[in-house]
Amino acid sequence: MIKQALLSVSDKTGIVDFARELNALGVTLLSTGGTAKLLADSGLPVTEVADYTGFPEMLDGRVKTLHPKVHGGILARRDLPEHMAALAEHDIPTIDLLVVNLYPFQQTVAKDDCTLPDAIENIDIGGPTMLRSAAKNHRDVTVIVDPADYAVVLDEMRANANSVGYDTNFRLATKVFAHTAQYDGAITNYLTSLGADKSHQGRSAYPQTLNLAFDKVQEMRYGENPHQSAAFYRDLRAVDGALANYVQLQGKELSYNNIADADAAWECVKSFDAASGAACVIIKHANPCGVALGANALEAYDKAFKTDSTSAFGGIIAFNVELDETAAQAVARQFVEVLIAPSFSAGARAVFAAKQNVRLLEIPLGQGINQYDFKRVGGGLLVQSPDARNVQPSELRVVTRRHPNPKEMDDLMFAWRVAKFVKSNAIVFCGGGMTLGVGAGQMSRVDSARIASIKAQNAGLTLAGSAVASDAFFPFRDGLDVVVDAGATCVIQPGGSMRDDEVIAAADERGIAMVVTGTRHFRH
C-alpha cells in the first residue's frame, strides 16, 4: 500500500496534477529542490527531503537524497522482520512510491555550445541511485521514470486501496533499468568520444565505446528464412520520417522481409520532394523494380508498374503523397504485400478494407538523417555515416564534348537519385520521369548494363534517347558501349577510374553526353 511518495523530476510534465491526485488519496509527499517548490507553489503539502532527513543539501545540490533515511525507506523489504525492525530502530518510514527522472544529459550534450563542465554537471547521481534502489525492491516499491505511467499507477491505486499490483511494479522496474542503462550508455558514448583536448567541438563521431539502445516492437514468426528467429527493435533515437515511426492501419503482422523491403521503399520514395510531384517506388528484395514521378499518385504508380510488372508481383509499394481512392483502385488490381504513404484517404482505406491481408503503413514524411548505418560482421559491427549526400546539378561536371540538353539533365538527375537505392553494381535506364530498366547486384558492371537493357526490352519499353546512371565508375568502356547500343544518349557516373580518359573518349566517339558527380553510391 502506498502511504508515502518521493517526487524529484527534471521533466515536470504532469507532475502537479499527479501529486494532487496522490494527495487526494492520502499519500504523504516528499520532494527536492525545484520540484518541491513547484508543488508548494501549487498549494500542495510537501516536505523537503532536507527537512525529512534532517541533513541539508550540500555541494551545490550534488548531495541531497544520498541518505540512509531515503534509501533505507526505499530498499527495506517489507516481508523481512529484521528489515522492518531496523527501520523502526532508526525511525525511518517506508517510501512506497518513487517518481524520478534524470538530469537532461543527452539534451545538454546535443547543444553546439556545450562544454565538458556543462556535460559533467548534468550527470545525475542521486536520481539513478534512487531509481535503481526502487527498481531492485519493486516487490514493495512502485517506481516511475516516465510521466506516461502516471495515469496507470493512479488507476490501480484507486481500484486497489492505494496498492499497485506486482505485474505493474515489475514492468515499471524493467523500464527503470532500461532507462538508467541508456542514460549511462549516453554518458559513456559522449566521454569516450572526446579527443585529447576534451573539447566538445573536437569530439569524434565514433566513440571508443559505443552503446546503442533499442526497444522491441514485436517478435516475428521467423526471420529472413523460416528456420531463423527474429524480432524488430525501434531505435530510441529514431529520427523524423524513419520507417520505425510507422502506424499500421490494417493487414497481417509485418514479417522480417516486409520491414526490410519497406525500409528500402520508404527511403527511396521520400528522397523525392513531394512539393515537386508524386513519386511511387516498387521494391522487390530490397531493390527498386520501378520508380516514377507523376502529376498524381495514379500516374506515378502506372509509370512505375510499367518498368517491370513481373517483378512488381508481391512487392512493396511506397508513395510520397497521400494515396487516394483512384490510385488505390489501380494498386488493388495487383498482389501487393505492403503499401506505404504519408496518409491514406478514406476512399483508399475503403478500397483495401476488402483486402485485409494487405498491410497499410502510414508514416509522416520527414527528412531526419540517422546518425549511423550498421552492418554486422563476424565478431564486430561496421559503423558509418548514412549515404545522405544528394548531388545538385550545379555540382555536376560535363566531361564530354556534347553537353546534355535540359530534358536529358532532368532524366540524369532522376536516374542518379534512383541508382543510389539499387544494389551494386547498379545500372539504371530512365526517361520521362520513370525507370525503364534496372540492372542490380551483378558482380560486373557490364552484366548489370546488359540485364537493365533486357529488362526494358521484356517490358516493351524503348531505350532510345534514355539516360543512364551508374552507381560507380565504368572500369572499362564495355559497359558504356552496352548502354549506348541499347539507345542511351547520356550517362551520369561518379568518375574516378584509372581508365576515365578511355571511357570519356568512348563517350565522345559514340556522340553521347557524360557528366560525373564525384560521389559514389555503392550499396551492399
Swiss-Prot record:
<keyword id="KW-0658">Purine biosynthesis</keyword>
<dbReference type="InterPro" id="IPR016193">
    <property type="entry name" value="Cytidine_deaminase-like"/>
</dbReference>
<feature type="domain" description="MGS-like">
    <location>
        <begin position="1"/>
        <end position="145"/>
    </location>
</feature>
<dbReference type="GO" id="GO:0005829">
    <property type="term" value="C:cytosol"/>
</dbReference>
<keyword id="KW-0511">Multifunctional enzyme</keyword>
<dbReference type="GO" id="GO:0004643">
    <property type="term" value="F:phosphoribosylaminoimidazolecarboxamide formyltransferase activity"/>
</dbReference>
<keyword id="KW-0378">Hydrolase</keyword>
<dbReference type="Pfam" id="PF02142">
    <property type="entry name" value="MGS"/>
</dbReference>
<dbReference type="GO" id="GO:0003937">
    <property type="term" value="F:IMP cyclohydrolase activity"/>
</dbReference>
<comment type="similarity">
    <text>Belongs to the PurH family.</text>
</comment>
<dbReference type="InterPro" id="IPR024051">
    <property type="entry name" value="AICAR_Tfase_dup_dom_sf"/>
</dbReference>
<comment type="pathway">
    <text>Purine metabolism; IMP biosynthesis via de novo pathway; 5-formamido-1-(5-phospho-D-ribosyl)imidazole-4-carboxamide from 5-amino-1-(5-phospho-D-ribosyl)imidazole-4-carboxamide (10-formyl THF route): step 1/1.</text>
</comment>
<dbReference type="GO" id="GO:0006189">
    <property type="term" value="P:'de novo' IMP biosynthetic process"/>
</dbReference>
<comment type="pathway">
    <text>Purine metabolism; IMP biosynthesis via de novo pathway; IMP from 5-formamido-1-(5-phospho-D-ribosyl)imidazole-4-carboxamide: step 1/1.</text>
</comment>
<dbReference type="Pfam" id="PF01808">
    <property type="entry name" value="AICARFT_IMPCHas"/>
</dbReference>
<keyword id="KW-0808">Transferase</keyword>
<dbReference type="InterPro" id="IPR036914">
    <property type="entry name" value="MGS-like_dom_sf"/>
</dbReference>
<protein>
    <recommendedName>
        <fullName>Bifunctional purine biosynthesis protein PurH</fullName>
        <ecNumber>2.1.2.3</ecNumber>
        <ecNumber>3.5.4.10</ecNumber>
    </recommendedName>
</protein>
<dbReference type="InterPro" id="IPR011607">
    <property type="entry name" value="MGS-like_dom"/>
</dbReference>
<dbReference type="InterPro" id="IPR002695">
    <property type="entry name" value="PurH-like"/>
</dbReference>
